[in-house]
Amino acid sequence: MRIGILTAGGDAPGMNAVIRAVVRSAEREGHEVIGIKRGYKGLIEGDFIKLTSRDVGGILDRGGTILLSSRDPRYKKLEYREKAYKNLNEQGIEALIILGGEGTLAGAKLTAEETGIPVIGVPCTIDNDVGGTEYCIGYDTALRNAVDAIDKIRDTASSHERIFIVEVMGRNRGFIAVEAGLATGAELILIPEERFPREQIPEEIEKAKKLGKLHFIIVLAEGYCRAKELEDFLLEKIGDKYGEIRSTVLGHIQRGGIPTHFDRIMGTKFGVVAYESLIAGERSGFVAYEKGKFYIEDFEKAQEYKPIDREAYKLNTRLAI
């Protein structure tokens, strides 16, 4: 079998572990893997490269993706998808493994339906917001990066008795904010799912100061509001009454760096399951992980709402005294 593999959308640490596992599993059993560079863009433009076990040597500890990635809105148009399908046919690709988040998996579903070839997705996103699976590749590393940064910010916030707003990724969901906030002892976590009233934030700061706290850390998911917006609001409401107010956006630092051991191991397991499911005859779906078990889930599930750990959120509120 000739298997195509691509990574699309935002990169996630651990993608290389998935690629390595697929290539080596396939080669061991006499199958061939063709890398498609820059995601759906490469599929449209015919940017293909043969991958061997040597090509994927020494990549487990590398962040990002050796296949490169992009977001290409052209793939939403049938004329460009037909061009991509023509390229697949000319390359003799009989099956696809597609790595990415919700949007990428929606494209994978469409590809499976329109081409009839087997397509298996692997959920890879630092936001951890793909429905139908407990875990998405890249989340653990992003969480580590956020925690490391917030720990460092607390050092300087403490030294200068400041109020710090730290914005983390999470356009629609607060997974990183909740766990990073709990792990670093944030005084307040703000996420789109809970919508803590903005007007009450000055009260929380005042309450903390009365309890003897010398500094105050707010971990803010970008989907709640932007850090500068909240900084301006607090400056208007309380000024520097309780200490200087500063904001920091962690941004893409959360995406990069050496993948954690967990993302390397999970990436390897996700990759092997994706490959084995193709060989076993699966035609369409993505690799899901739930309660210690891997299985193939319907693509539709990827778009379903995935709840955050509200117990963790409430626990942080209880302990932030």
Curated annotation (Swiss-Prot):
ADP binds at R20, A21, V22, V23, R24, R154, G185, A186, E187, K213, L214, H215. GO terms for molecular function: 6-phosphofructokinase activity; ATP binding; fructose-6-phosphate binding; metal ion binding. InterPro entries: ATP_PFK, ATP_PFK_prok-type, PFKA_ATP_prok, Phosphofructokinase_CS, Phosphofructokinase_dom, PKF_sf. It comes from the Bacteria. One of its GO terms (cellular component) is 6-phosphofructokinase complex. Pathway: Carbohydrate degradation; glycolysis; D-glyceraldehyde 3-phosphate and glycerone phosphate from D-glucose: step 3/4. Substrate binds at T125, I126, D127, R162, M169, G170, R171, E222, R246, H252, I253, Q254, R255. Keywords: Allosteric enzyme, ATP-binding, Cytoplasm, Glycolysis, Kinase, Magnesium, Metal-binding, Nucleotide-binding, Transferase. It catalyses: beta-D-fructose 6-phosphate + ATP = beta-D-fructose 1,6-bisphosphate + ADP + H(+). The keyword Metal-binding applies. Allosterically activated by ADP and other diphosphonucleosides, and allosterically inhibited by phosphoenolpyruvate. It is found in: Cytoplasm. Transmembrane segments: none annotated. Its main location: cytoplasm. The active site is at D127. Its EC number is 2.7.1.11. Its cofactor is Mg(2+). SUPFAM superfamilies: Phosphofructokinase. One of its GO terms (biological process) is fructose 1,6-bisphosphate metabolic process. Mg(2+) binds at E102. ATP binds at G10, R71, D72, G101, E102, G103, T104. Belongs to the phosphofructokinase type A (PFKA) family. ATP-dependent PFK group I subfamily. Prokaryotic clade 'B1' sub-subfamily. Homotetramer. Catalyzes the phosphorylation of D-fructose 6-phosphate to fructose 1,6-bisphosphate by ATP, the first committing step of glycolysis. This is ATP-dependent 6-phosphofructokinase. The lineage of its organism: Bacteria, Pseudomonadati, Aquificota, Aquificia, Aquificales.
